[in-house]
């Protein structure tokens, strides 16, 4: 058998490099997609953090409100004097 020519060897090397470049390009494309997903996730987490902060602010405002005033005591009813000859109701 004859030895492969130098051009054949170069062609084989170029094909091997091309195959490796294609594999690397596939990985880079996947990394780009993953980074877009991470950016979207980062945005969502930022929005969630803002909402949680808003809720915490609302809850802390309620805690800072003054206590409502105590209800006014009911006035005491005056004593009804006993009047001779008058019957009182038993409902009292």
From Swiss-Prot:
<protein>
    <recommendedName>
        <fullName>Protein p10</fullName>
    </recommendedName>
</protein>
<comment type="function">
    <text>Seems to be involved in the morphogenesis of the polyhedra. Forms extensive fibrillar structures in both nucleus and cytoplasm. It is involved in the liberation of polyhedra from infected-insect cell.</text>
</comment>
<keyword id="KW-0842">Viral occlusion body</keyword>
<comment type="similarity">
    <text>Belongs to the baculoviridae p10 family.</text>
</comment>
<dbReference type="Pfam" id="PF05531">
    <property type="entry name" value="NPV_P10"/>
</dbReference>
<keyword id="KW-0426">Late protein</keyword>
<dbReference type="InterPro" id="IPR008702">
    <property type="entry name" value="NPV_P10"/>
</dbReference>
<feature type="region of interest" description="Disordered">
    <location>
        <begin position="60"/>
        <end position="92"/>
    </location>
</feature>
<dbReference type="GO" id="GO:0039679">
    <property type="term" value="C:viral occlusion body"/>
</dbReference>
């Amino acid at each position: 058998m004859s030895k492969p020519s130098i051009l054949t060897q170069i062609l084989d090397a170029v094909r091997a490099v091309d195959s490796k470049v294609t594999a690397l390009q596939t990985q880079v494309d996947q990394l780009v997609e993953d980074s877009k997903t991470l950016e979207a996730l980062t945005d969502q987490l930022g929005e969630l953090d803002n909402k949680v902060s808003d809720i915490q602010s609302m809850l802390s405002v309620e805690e800072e409100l003054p206590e409502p005033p105590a209800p006014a005591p009911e006035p005491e009813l005056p004593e009804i004097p006993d009047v001779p000859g008058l019957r009182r109701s038993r409902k009292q």
